Amino acid sequence: KIFKYILIYLNIMANRIEQMEMVQNEGLELFKKKNKDYGDAFAEYGVIGVLVRMGDKIKRLQNIEKNQITLVNDEKMKDTLIDLHNYAAMAIMLLDEDDK
């Protein structure tokens, strides 16, 4: 019986890894598109600027959840979360650059 539970657990963990890879890939594709349009604009104001943009995204999430509506161009909660994912990565990139 314990073997059955171990297999179930391992299957769940493998699926989580696949899910994470999908989220990472989706975020990367969006980053590529936006980077083509905007370049390194996110770096202009440094980490603080990225954190401000993250705050804007969090506020948008709160409004979407509270009012069950979208705010800009039918932006959904998932889209905003992917943006947050990318902003976090951008902040890490800037921090890494500062450490060099």
Q: Model-derived features: where do they sit?
A:
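Intrinsically disordered, low-complexity regulatory regions
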Residues: 3-100
